[in-house]
């Protein structure tokens, strides 16, 4: 089946699809606080979703392209779930968030098919994959159109990987008690087995969102990167996120001695946002299998246990948390009680001495991850490093922070 035909088949209208902002029906909605964060973007009046320009640009999207798609959404006069929120157009049609970003992705998909130069074609496929992922953002459970966009993103990513430098292998991992999961192993040029970083991504991202991290930071150092989706999304959608948040990643770690391209004696974990919750759990529970753990903007305690901190978080992010936990109809109070159980301090891990070297990077006044969380991580480690990343200039400091983190990982792996 051609890519064009696949797109037509997946998005063929069958029934009135639920609109993304209606999927989580929490009560006690409060006033929306203005929020700005390097990793999550910022709240903009009249938008349900946080607009995450830094990360989208970092993944290769032109700022003008972002504005063009936003303009098409704003200009639509189609019916909306909430007339005050631009990105709540109902149905797969002009003005709908998923429709507009997927339409933009199809433009790059067509460019990729028409391009004769393999590397340039690969770049176009990667661009399309990223746009499909933005279409599916924030990846709420039960969002049928978003899941179809994710399927197209994965297809485009596989096409890109065949044409871009290095090697990518799609791998299946068995997890007892449930469905197997699929991961992507990205390998640099040269002969393996390679030192490898196991990526633990944020809850509002897909595993295919981290190619830039591999290409710009790990591959030049001869380090491979292995990704899997977080529980309840993408290839891990059949698994619910539980208090044992590191379950899937633990089974992947245990399988690495059987993967010939990975040097299982030289493995580190890198966690973004809630992915740091997974990575730090691994540092405690699987320390013999890990040389190091690095975290960026970790969500390990405060956001999960502090009501005041939760009040500062946008509705969309609370919806993401509720969706991952399978609490689509929960009150804020019920969600708060459940989130507290995910705190690694409440679980009795953080605060205990951990033999695994751990680095944690943070931004001052980050509403999702205060400095205290990073200090808690690094002070618990026998070899801890605290890294403050200045906010402005945001893109340059983000790059500088990642260079420092990957250099720290390299010293412990190579």
UniProtKB/Swiss-Prot annotation:
It comes from the Bacteria. InterPro entries: AB_hydrolase_fold, FrsA, FrsA-like, FrsA_esterase. Pfam families: FrsA-like (PF06500). It catalyses: a carboxylic ester + H2O = an alcohol + a carboxylate + H(+). Its EC number is 3.1.1.1. Gene3D superfamilies: alpha/beta hydrolase. One of its GO terms (molecular function) is carboxylesterase activity. This is Esterase FrsA. The gene is frsA.
């Amino acid at each position: 089946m051609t890519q064009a035909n696949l797109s037509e088949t997946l998005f063929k209208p069958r029934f009135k699809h639920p609109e993304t902002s209606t999927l989580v029906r929490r009560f006690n909605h409060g006033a929306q606080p203005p929020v700005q964060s390097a990793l999550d973007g910022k709240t903009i009046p009249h938008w349900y979703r946080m607009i995450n320009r830094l990360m989208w640009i970092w993944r290769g999207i032109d700022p003008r392209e972002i504005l063009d798609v936003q303009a098409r959404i704003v200009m639509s006069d189609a019916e909306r779930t909430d007339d005050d929120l631009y990105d709540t157009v109902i149905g797969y049609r002009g003005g709908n968030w998923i429709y507009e970003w997927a339409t933009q992705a199809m433009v790059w998909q067509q460019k990729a098919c028409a391009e004769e130069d393999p590397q340039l074609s690969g770049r176009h496929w990667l661009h399309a994959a990223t746009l499909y992922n933005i279409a599916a953002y924030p990846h709420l459970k039960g969002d049928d159109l978003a899941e179809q966009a994710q399927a197209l993103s994965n297809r485009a990513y596989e096409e890109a990987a065949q044409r871009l430098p290095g090697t990518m292998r799609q791998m299946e991992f068995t997890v007892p008690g449930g469905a197997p999961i699929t991961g992507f192993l990205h390998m640099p040029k040269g002969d393996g087995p390679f030192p490898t970083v196991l990526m633990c991504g944020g809850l509002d991202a897909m595993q295919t969102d981290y190619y830039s991290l591999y290409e710009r930071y790990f591959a030049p150092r001869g380090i491979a990167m292995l990704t899997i989706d977080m529980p309840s999304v993408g290839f891990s959608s059949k698994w619910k996120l539980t208090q044992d948040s590191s379950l899937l990643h633990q089974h992947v770690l245990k399988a690495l001695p059987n993967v010939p391209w990975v040097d299982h004696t030289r493995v580190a974990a890198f966690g973004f946002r809630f992915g740091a919750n997974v990575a730090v759990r691994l540092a405690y529970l699987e320390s013999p299998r890990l040389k190091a753990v690095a975290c960026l903007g970790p969500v390990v305690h405060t956001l999960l246990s502090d009501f005041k901190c939760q009040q500062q978080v946008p509705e969309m992010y609370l919806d993401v948390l509720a969706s991952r936990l399978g609490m689509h109809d929960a009150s804020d109070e019920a969600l708060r009680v459940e989130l507290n159980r995910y705190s690694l301090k409440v679980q009795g891990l953080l605060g205990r001495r951990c033999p695994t070297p751990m680095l944690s990077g943070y931004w001052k006044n980050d509403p999702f991850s205060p400095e205290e969380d990073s200090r808690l991580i690094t002070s618990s480690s026998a070899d801890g490093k605290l890294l403050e990343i200045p906010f402005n200039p945001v893109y340059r400091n983000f790059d500088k922070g990642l260079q420092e983190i990957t250099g720290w990982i390299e010293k412990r792996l190579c």
